[in-house]
C-alpha cells in the first residue's frame, strides 16, 4: 500500500505542516484529508495546474474530489472561513505569534477517552502528529472540540457533569494552554476514592502528572492566600474558589535570542522553600519577546523537570543547566493572581523605611522650633521635623519632571535628578540577584529607554546607550559590583546623592523673607575649611555701616555668651559663639578688640553676611538680663533655616539704613580676638558646652545629614 504526503500551510504561518496518509496519491480525497485534520470550518486550497494560468491554488469543497498531486505529494493551503468562529478560545489563529503553545498531545490533558477512540487516529497518523510541531497539535485540538460537540454520542456525562457543559475541561489546556483550578474544584472531575497522586485518566500518564502538578500547586497557593486574609480584613470576603489559578506552558525558541532574560526569586519560610517565582524580565530576552510570562508568576516546570519537590538551590542549578543547553525551552508557570509586581515585591519609595531614633527627632523638633514659628518657611513645603518626611516633599511642584526641559546639552546631574524622581517613570525597586537583594535598582535597558524618550537630541537608541555609558563612567549610576562597562542586562543603582542634595530647597523663593529665603539644604564643609561663598549682593566680610555712633562698643550679639545656643557646625565640634568664661578672659586681656570690629577688618571671623531672622524690635531686654535669658531667647528664635546653616551665627548688622541697636555700655563685652583662626573659620567649642536639650537632637541630625540614604529617607 502506498503512502501520500500532504504538505499544508495554515493561514499565514510561514512553516508548513506535513501529514502522511496510508493511501496512494491517486486515491486520496478531500474527505480523507479532512478526517486527519478535523477542521470543518476551513477552506481548502490545493496546488494544481491550469491550462491558461499555469500553477494556481484551486479551492476544493467536494469531499469526494480527488486531490491534485505533484511529485507524489499534495500541497494545500488552509484558510479560515470568514465569519466562522471555530473555537471560543480567546485568540486568533491569524497571528501565530500570539498562539499559546500547548503540550504536544492531541488528545488534551485529562481526556477520558483513550487514543484508540478517535477515528483516523491510526498508528502512523498518531505517530506523525506527535512528532509535528506544537502549533499543529494546538490547532488540531482546537478544531477537534466543536466536532465532538456536534455528535450526540459526545454528550456523555462524567461524574454527573455533561461534557458539553464544561468545555474548558483539561482538554482546554491543550488549546489555550490555560486551566482554571477553581473549575477543577467545583466539579467532581477526579475519582474521590482513588489515591491523591493518581487520577482516573491512567491511560495518559503525562497528562495525569500535569493534573497532579496543578492540584498540588493549588494547595500551596491556597496556604499563601490564607495568610494574606489573616493580615488584611479587606480580603475576608474572597475565597479560594474566586482566586483562579491560571497555568500556562510556553515554549521558547532559543535560536533567535541569546539569553532567556528572567531573574528568579526564591521564597522560603520555616516550613521550607516556598517555590521559585519570576522576579523580573529583562528586555531583549526570549521571555520578554514572548510576552506571556510576567513578574510574579510561579515557575512550576522547565522542559520535563518538575520543580514541585525541589529546593530553591536545586531549581536554580537545574535552570542554569537547561539554559546552557541548545534547543527550545518549555516553561510551565502559574500566573499570579495580581500580575502587577508593585504591590507584592516592592516598597513605596515615597516613605522612609530605615529605622531612626524617634526620640532624638522629637527633641530636635522641639529644640529647633520652640514656641515660635519657623521664619521664612512656606506652609506648602514640609520641613524635616518628623519621621514621615521625605526628600521628595521638599521639592517644589515647579521642579517636577514635566517642567524639566532635558536635552543632550543639559547637565548630567539635572538629568539624573529627573531620572531619580519618583514620577520619572523609571522602574526603580528592590531586585534579587544570586539571592542577594539589591535595593532600589534598575535595569540598564530601562535607563536607555528612559533617556531616549525623555531627553531631546538623540537620533537613535544607540546614542542614548552611549549617554548611559557616560553616566556610568561619571559616577551618576553605579554597577552593583562596580563594573565600568555598561550593559543593558545588568542592574544599576544611583550614585552618591550628596552632590544632588544641594539642589533641594526648603523655601519658596518669593522674596517675602529677605535673604533668609536663600537657605538651601547642602552638605556642610569640614570644620577646618573655610565656608563656601554666600549668595548675597555683597561679599564677605560686610562693609561697616556708615552711621555708627558708638564705634567703641561691640554689638549685642556677644553679650554674656549668647552664642552658646547659636547654631553649631553639624560635626558638633565647632561653634559660632564662645563660652562665657573665655569671653571674660578675653575682655580683660584685649580691651581694644571692639575697636578693630568697627573698622571692618579681616578680624571679624565670627561674623557672617546673613540677614537676621530677628528684627531690631525682637531683641528683647531679656538678652541683656543674664545668660539664662539670653540662651532662651536664642533658642526661641532658632528656626529650621538657621539650623541648616549651622556653621553661621546671627548677623552683625541690621537691615540697610537702620543703625544697630546697642545696649548699656556696662553690659557689653568684646568679641573673641581675631587670632582664633583664618577669616571665615568659626571658633572651636566642645560639644559638652551645648545645652543638653540640643545634644541628642544634633547627634541624630548629624547622622542623618552625613548618611542621607541610610538614616534619612529611601530616596531612590
From Swiss-Prot:
Pfam families reported in the protein's UniProt record: DEP, Dishevelled, DIX, Dsh_C, PDZ
Location of Phosphothreonine modifications: 346
Keyword Phosphoprotein: yes
One annotated Gene Ontology cellular component of this protein: chromatin
Listed Basic residues bias regions: 213-226
Dimethylated arginine, modified sites: 698
Known role: Involved in the signal transduction pathway mediated by multiple Wnt genes.
Protein name per its UniProtKB record: Segment polarity protein dishevelled homolog DVL-3
Naturally occurring in which organism (per UniProt): Homo sapiens
Amino acid at each position: 500500500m502506498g503512502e501520500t504526503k500532504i504538505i499544508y500551510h495554515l493561514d499565514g504561518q510561514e512553516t508548513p505542516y506535513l501529514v502522511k496518509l496510508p493511501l496512494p496519491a491517486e486515491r486520496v480525497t478531500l474527505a480523507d484529508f479532512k478526517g486527519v485534520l478535523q477542521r470543518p470550518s476551513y477552506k481548502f486550497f490545493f496546488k494544481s495546474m491550469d491550462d491558461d494560468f499555469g500553477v494556481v491554488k484551486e479551492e476544493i469543497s467536494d469531499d469526494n474530489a480527488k486531490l491534485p498531486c505533484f511529485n507524489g505529494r499534495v500541497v494545500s493551503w488552509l484558510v479560515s472561513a470568514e465569519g466562522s468562529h471555530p473555537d471560543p478560545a480567546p485568540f486568533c489563529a491569524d497571528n501565530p505569534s500570539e498562539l499559546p503553545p500547548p503540550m504536544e498531545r492531541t488528545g488534551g490533558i485529562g481526556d477520558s477517552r483513550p487514543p484508540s477512540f478517535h477515528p483516523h487516529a491510526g498508528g502512523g497518523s498518531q505517530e506523525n502528529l506527535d512528532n509535528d510541531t506544537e502549533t499543529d497539535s494546538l490547532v488540531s485540538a482546537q478544531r477537534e472540540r466543536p466536532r465532538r460537540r456536534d455528535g450526540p454520542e459526545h454528550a456523555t456525562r462524567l461524574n454527573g457533569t455533561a461534557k458539553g457543559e464544561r468545555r474548558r475541561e483539561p482538554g482546554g489546556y491543550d488549546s489555550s494552554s490555560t486551566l482554571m483550578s477553581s473549575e477543577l474544584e467545583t466539579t467532581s472531575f477526579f475519582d474521590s476514592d482513588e489515591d491523591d497522586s493518581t487520577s482516573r485518566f491512567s491511560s495518559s500518564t503525562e497528562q495525569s502528572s500535569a493534573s497532579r502538578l496543578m492540584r498540588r500547586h493549588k494547595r500551596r497557593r491556597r496556604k499563601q492566600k490564607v495568610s494574606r486574609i489573616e493580615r488584611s480584613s479587606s480580603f475576608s470576603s474572597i475565597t479560594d474558589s474566586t482566586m483562579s489559578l491560571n497555568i500556562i506552558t510556553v515554549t521558547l525558541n532559543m535560536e533567535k535570542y541569546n539569553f532567556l532574560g528572567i531573574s528568579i526569586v526564591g521564597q522560603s519560610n520555616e516550613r521550607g522553600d516556598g517555590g521559585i517565582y519570576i522576579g523580573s524580565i529583562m528586555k531583549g530576552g526570549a521571555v520578554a519577546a514572548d510576552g506571556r510570562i510576567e513578574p510574579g508568576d510561579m515557575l512550576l516546570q522547565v522542559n520535563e523537570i518538575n520543580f514541585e519537590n525541589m529546593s530553591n538551590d536545586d531549581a536554580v542549578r537545574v535552570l542554569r543547566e537547561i539554559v546552557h543547553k541548545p534547543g527550545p525551552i518549555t516553561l510551565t508557570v502559574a500566573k499570579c493572581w495580581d500580575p502587577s509586581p508593585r504591590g507584592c515585591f516592592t516598597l513605596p519609595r515615597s516613605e522612609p523605611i530605615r529605622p531612626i531614633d524617634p526620640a532624638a527627632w522629637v527633641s530636635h523638633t522641639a529644640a529647633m522650633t520652640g514656641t515660635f514659628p519657623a521664619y521664612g518657611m512656606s506652609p506648602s513645603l514640609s520641613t524635616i521635623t518628623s519621621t514621615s518626611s521625605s526628600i521628595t516633599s521638599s521639592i517644589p511642584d515647579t521642579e517636577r519632571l514635566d517642567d524639566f526641559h532635558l536635552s543632550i546639552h543639559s547637565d548630567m546631574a539635572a538629568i539624573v535628578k529627573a531620572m531619580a524622581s519618583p514620577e520619572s517613570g523609571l522602574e526603580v525597586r528592590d531586585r534579587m540577584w544570586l539571592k542577594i537583594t539589591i535595593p532600589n535598582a534598575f535595569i540598564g535597558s530601562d535607563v536607555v529607554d528612559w533617556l531616549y524618550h525623555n531627553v531631546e537630541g538623540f537620533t537613535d537608541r544607540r546614542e542614548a546607550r552611549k549617554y548611559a555609558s557616560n553616566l556610568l563612567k561619571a559616577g551618576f549610576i553605579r554597577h552593583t559590583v562596580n563594573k565600568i562597562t555598561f550593559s543593558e542586562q545588568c542592574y544599576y543603582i544611583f550614585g552618591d546623592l550628596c552632590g544632588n542634595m544641594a539642589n533641594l530647597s526648603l523655601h519658596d523663593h518669593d522674596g517675602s523673607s529677605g535673604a533668609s529665603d536663600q537657605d538651601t539644604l547642602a552638605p556642610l564643609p569640614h570644620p577646618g575649611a573655610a565656608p563656601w561663598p554666600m549668595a548675597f549682593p555683597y561679599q564677605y566680610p560686610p562693609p561697616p555701616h556708615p552711621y555708627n555712633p558708638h564705634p567703641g562698643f561691640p554689638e549685642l550679639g556677644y553679650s554674656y555668651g549668647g552664642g552658646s545656643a547659636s547654631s553649631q557646625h553639624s560635626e558638633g565640634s565647632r561653634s559660632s559663639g564662645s563660652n562665657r568664661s573665655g569671653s571674660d578672659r578675653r575682655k580683660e586681656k584685649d580691651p581694644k578688640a571692639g575697636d578693630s570690629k568697627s573698622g571692618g577688618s579681616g578680624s571679624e571671623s565670627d561674623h557672617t553676611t546673613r540677614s537676621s531672622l530677628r528684627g531690631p524690635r525682637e531683641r528683647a531686654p531679656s538678652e541683656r538680663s543674664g545668660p539664662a535669658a539670653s540662651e532662651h531667647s536664642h533658642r526661641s528664635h532658632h528656626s529650621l533655616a538657621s539650623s541648616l546653616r549651622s556653621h553661621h551665627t546671627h548677623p552683625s548688622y541690621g537691615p540697610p539704613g537702620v543703625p544697630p541697636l546697642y545696649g548699656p555700655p556696662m553690659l557689653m563685652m568684646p568679641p573673641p580676638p581675631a587670632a582664633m583662626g583664618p577669616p571665615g573659620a568659626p571658633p572651636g567649642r566642645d560639644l559638652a558646652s551645648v545645652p543638653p536639650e540640643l545634644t541628642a537632637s544634633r547627634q541624630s541630625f548629624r547622622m542623618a545629614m552625613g548618611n542621607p540614604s541610610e538614616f534619612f529617607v529611601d530616596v531612590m
